[in-house]
Design a protein with these regions (language model features):
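A short alpha-helical cap/connector motif
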Residues: 1-132, 139-156
Length: 157
């Protein structure tokens, strides 16, 4: 049970949420067993919300800052336009293997572009207009988002 959420709220969410897809359950389990700081993983409930929002928006160009093990990117990919792409950035090179593994297994691997390094250096090289930006790493990116992403939809964790 999640120690940060009120039990009544958690019970309500559990009763009224979509089930976590099997692949995401596998990724969740592997992250918790093998990766340092698994609490950084997006919860299954947050993932379902990201999926629903993505399905409503049907984004073509997505920017995610903070890939971690790829859970949230896979949730967003569920609603991605058939010709859409997710640019996901993480500074931790050690996580690329687990990200790749699950991106390939998902069927969205060709629509998810991984970038390893400092987002402030990578974003200008991508040179895209994003219609969905998910800031999952550092709240400091809010300033960037407000300044450079007119017209985007933001999900800020």
């Amino acid at each position: 049970m999640n120690e940060f959420i009120n039990k009544d709220i958690l019970n309500y969410v559990e009763l009224n949420s979509q089930q976590e897809p099997t692949l995401l359950k596998e990724l969740n389990k592997e992250t918790n067993l093998k990766i340092l700081n698994p609490r950084m993983l997006c919860s299954s409930y947050q993932g379902r919300v990201l999926s629903i929002i993505s399905k409503i928006i049907r984004p073509k160009n997505v920017l995610e800052i903070g890939t971690y093990t790829g859970y949230s990117a896979l949730c967003i990919a569920e609603g991605l336009d058939k010709n859409g792409i997710i640019h996901t950035i993480d500074i931790n090179e050690e996580l690329k293997e687990i990200q790749n593994k699950y991106f390939k297994k998902s069927g969205f691997g060709n629509q998810i572009q991984q970038h390893i390094g400092n987002a402030i250096e990578i974003i200008p090289k991508i040179n895209e207009c994003f219609d969905f930006v998910y800031l999952d790493a550092c709240i400091c990116w809010i300033t960037w988002g407000i300044t450079w992403s007119y017209g985007c939809k933001f999900i800020i964790k």
